[in-house]
Amino acid sequence: KTLYLMRHGQTLFNVRRKIQGACDSPLTELGIQQAGIASAYFDDIDLDHAYSSTAERASDTLEIVTNELMPYKRLKGLKEMHFGTFEGESEDLNPKDKSTFFVQYGGESGDQVMERMVRTCTEIMEQDDHQNVLAVSHAGACIHFLRAWQDPREVVKNGITNCCVFKYEYDVEAKTFALLEVERHGF
């Protein structure tokens, strides 16, 4: 079983360097183009199910990638980390260590995001008819999911670009995910 966990395309808040987790902003023209380019990655992959975060930036990305030809489900479990009262503020306010910082401001900890993502992706892949699944999520959520299975530093060092795809193999017996590749599409 294979899970393709993908980050959404570039958004207005990405360009403006605004913190966005629970809040949302639209895809930019470049973000729309990125999703179109990323769709080619899936040309020879027979996806059987698709999911996205409830954020519009993620569902819009998924619709572009699948040419609006595939039904999908929006899941709260795939949402980005909640940054509390820092939502919509400048990224310059981000602390060096984000692991628990936002909890005191009504947000989530990194461990909470990791547990939510692991639970959600495991529930998705445990379904019998789910062999090749696309799930569109967010940079922070993708990093915290990866952190459950390996040290993410090497992957993060090379960037979590918009529309990058994390290809995971799901082991049904062990209920674990193994990262096979990260496709950044040259972005």
Question: Which ranges hold each PLM region?
Answer:
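Active-site signature of alpha/beta-hydrolase-fold catalytic machinery across serine-
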Residues: 64, 144-148
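Active-site-proximal alpha-helix that buttresses catalytic centers in soluble enzyme cores
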Residues: 1-68, 108-111
